[in-house]
Amino acid sequence: MVDTTKNTKLFTSYGVTTSKAINPDMAAKMISKAKRPLFVVGTGVLRPEILDRAVKIAKKANLPIAATGSSLNGFLDKDVDAKYINVHQLGFYLTDPAWPGLDGKGNYDTIIILEFKKYYINQVLSGTKNFSKVKSISIGKDYIQNATMSFGNISREEHFAALDELIDLL
């Protein structure tokens, strides 16, 4: 008799997997625990009240920044490690475990996402969610269901308060 129940591996999962809603203290813990984090910012970060907070987050947690779209201009004189990359290319590269990263030191284990259009970043994160082991944490004001973890849908004022709390906890 052949035992067909041994050595089973799950190659596919069915159903919808969505991100876990988190608060700033959980986000701070996850960012602090990451071995190779990368802060990925969209063009929405150029608003002064967001840019100041993004710089503080990057400096406090010592995060390299992947500046997408036209966001690099906001970081040029801020004394942070920011490099330009197209967000779709970044999503593709993150699925390759052999990718050397933006600094040549290897792929990243955690990405922190801020200030993208919801419909846009969800498509990019769909690939990383399904084809890599990279964790993604969205700290934007909109709930991003394809991230591993995300802030919920919050108002702009609540978002500023959440980012300030995150900065204090890092």
From Swiss-Prot:
Matches recorded under Pfam families: CO_dh
Keyword Nucleus assigned: no
A biological process term (GO) from this entry: methanogenesis, from acetate
SUPFAM superfamilies in alphabetical order: DHS-like NAD/FAD-binding domain (SSF52467)
Pathway the protein acts in: One-carbon metabolism; methanogenesis from acetate
General function of this protein: Part of a complex that catalyzes the reversible cleavage of acetyl-CoA, allowing growth on acetate as sole source of carbon and energy. The alpha-epsilon subcomponent functions as a carbon monoxide dehydrogenase. The precise role of the epsilon subunit is unclear; it may have a stabilizing role within the alpha(2)epsilon(2) component and/or be involved in electron transfer to FAD during a potential FAD-mediated CO oxidation.
Subunit structure: Heterotetramer of two alpha and two epsilon subunits. The ACDS complex is made up of alpha, epsilon, beta, gamma and delta subunits with a probable stoichiometry of (alpha(2)epsilon(2))(4)-beta(8)-(gamma(1)delta(1))(8).
Protein name: Acetyl-CoA decarbonylase/synthase complex subunit epsilon 1
Organism from which the protein derives: Methanosarcina thermophila
Highest classification ranks of the organism: Archaea, Methanobacteriati, Methanobacteriota, Stenosarchaea group, Methanomicrobia
